[in-house]
């Protein structure tokens, strides 16, 4: 879906067209989920934050301005919701006892992730992982990522290339280890 098509759907949603929301959801859910996963690295949290992002989209659609970057707007909502949730969870977990963690455990899907995703989680920082996910998985252009993140295009390209080099090195190291 192009930015212009998404912009039109956002405007339809502003006017109360419920079918526009369904189309927005169906056309953006895969990329948005991958983006959220790159931030929180937990499947259940990503599902929850995706729901939160779409709820906030609906409740704040009146703030959307025609012609602005709808993808950047939606991804910013998702990013802010996810970061807020992670910060809230950190505060809560700081007050929980070690026994609770040992008793109930925590869920991690690292074992179920692809080797590339595991390598991303292992060697990339949050910003690098975000850029790689937005470009390689969600299909955004470097210019669009720069708009979304508020970084210069050159910095986005440099971070992307640097992240790819780290991933390549890590995957080669893992491949050598297996052979």
Map each language-model feature to its residues:
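A short pre-motif secondary-structure segment
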Residues: 131-135
């Amino acid at each position: 879906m192009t930015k212009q098509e998404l912009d039109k759907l956002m405007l339809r949603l502003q006017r109360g067209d419920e079918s526009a929301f369904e189309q927005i959801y169906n056309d953006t859910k895969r990329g948005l989920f991958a983006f959220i996963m790159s931030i929180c690295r937990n499947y259940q949290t990503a599902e929850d934050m995706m729901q939160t992002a779409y709820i906030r989209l609906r409740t704040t659609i009146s703030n959307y301005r025609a012609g602005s970057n709808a993808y950047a707007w939606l991804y910013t909502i998702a990013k802010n919701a996810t970061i807020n949730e992670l910060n809230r969870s950190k505060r809560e977990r700081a007050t929980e006892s070690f026994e609770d963690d040992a008793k109930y455990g925590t869920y991690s899907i690292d074992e179920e992730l692809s080797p590339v995703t595991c390598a991303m989680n292992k060697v990339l920082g949050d910003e690098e992982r975000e850029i790689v996910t937005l470009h390689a998985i969600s299909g955004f252009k470097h210019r669009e990522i720069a708009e979304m993140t508020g970084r210069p295009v050159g910095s986005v390209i440099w971070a992307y290339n640097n992240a790819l080099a780290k991933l390549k090195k890590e995957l080669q190291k893992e491949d050598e280890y297996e052979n």
